[in-house]
């Protein structure tokens, strides 16, 4: 097996705390440079938040779906050394109380929402609603969203979903959060505007395992339980965990927003007809 558990302790060039993508890539590249590396992780598995597990023949992304995408050919060639990638293209669907809309926001979305058929008609509708809302300089997420896509789309496809996601009203969130959201005046529902995208065939866990081949890995241990002992095992430490924990919460705890995953196995061939469906009402 490529991945094995450390049996004895010795001096390493690097201690890598965290066996996720960053830790695995760093360890792989350090080993390629002739460095000795020990990777530790408090979880019982490698791959961090991209950990995948096969259930009923399906590669389940245990911490939420992850689609690899990049414009960098060097990066794409690198990850393809460790896994074959499929041709998955992320084209989400928004479900608002049974109404289905195309994501990211594009001409399919605008056509369904307003019946417009040309980019100029869509842009005019957005400008009309932006003017009606009296927004000139967006001060929060709500105003920024209306400036980008108008009031109707904000109310149906952004407001409730964002409140569920962040646990706060949209007018209490900063505007920059939504600025990266793709908005297109074309009939293009490919979420990522990247040259290369896909998901590793066999799952991310196998890809990370291949990256860590021949590298000492110790799982199920908390770095902070024996920090001084682990620090003494290597010349340098590469820490990939929570930054507030690393500094022992001396400046307080960072305000993380997380989700709860509920898994259910259904005896049907296809549940929702699309890999990603956003349920955008507030419930």
Name each region found by the language model.
Residues 31-55:
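Glycine-rich FAD pyrophosphate-binding loop
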Residues 97-101, 108-236, 240, 245-247:
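Active-site/ligand-binding neighborhood in enzyme catalytic cores
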Residues 36, 59, 84, 216-218:
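Conserved beta-strand segments of alpha/beta enzyme cores
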Residues 17-19, 40-42, 70-71, 202, ...:
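Short His-Asn-centered micro-motif
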Residues 56-131:
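Dinucleotide-binding Rossmann-like beta1-alpha1 core, especially the glycine-rich loop
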Residues 33, 222-283:
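Mid-domain catalytic core of redox enzymes
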């Amino acid at each position: 097996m490529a991945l094995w558990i450390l049996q004895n302790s010795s001096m390493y060039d690097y201690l890598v705390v965290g066996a996720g993508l960053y830790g695995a890539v760093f360890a792989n590249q350090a080993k390629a440079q002739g460095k000795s590396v020990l990777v530790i992780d408090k979880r019982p598995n490698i791959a961090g938040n991209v950990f995948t597990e096969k259930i009923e023949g399906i590669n389940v992304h245990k911490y939420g779906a992850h689609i690899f995408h990049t414009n960098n050919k060097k990066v794409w060639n690198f990850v393809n050394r460790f896994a074959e990638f499929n041709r998955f293209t992320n084209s989400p669907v928004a479900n608002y109380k049974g109404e289905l809309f195309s994501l990211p926001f594009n001409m399919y979305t605008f056509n369904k929402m307003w019946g417009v058929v040309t980019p100029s008609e869509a842009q005019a509708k957005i400008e009309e609603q932006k003017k009606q809302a009296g927004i000139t300089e967006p001060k929060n997420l709500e105003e920024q969203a209306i400036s980008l896509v108008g009031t109707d789309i904000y109310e149906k496809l952004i407001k409730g979903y964002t409140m569920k996601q962040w646990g706060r009203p949209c007018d209490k969130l900063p505007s920059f959060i939504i600025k990266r959201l793709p908005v297109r005046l074309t009939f293009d529902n490919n979420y990522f505007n990247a040259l290369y995208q896909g998901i590793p065939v066999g799952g991310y866990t196998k890809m990370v395992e291949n990256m860590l081949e021949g590298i000492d890995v110790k799982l199920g241990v908390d770095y902070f339980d024996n920090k001084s002992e682990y620090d003494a095992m290597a010349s340098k430490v590469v820490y990939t965990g929570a930054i507030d924990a690393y500094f022992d919460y001396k400046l307080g705890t960072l305000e993380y927003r997380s989700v709860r995953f509920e898994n259910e196995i259904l005896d049907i061939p296809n549940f929702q007809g699309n890999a990603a469906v956003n349920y955008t009402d507030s419930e």
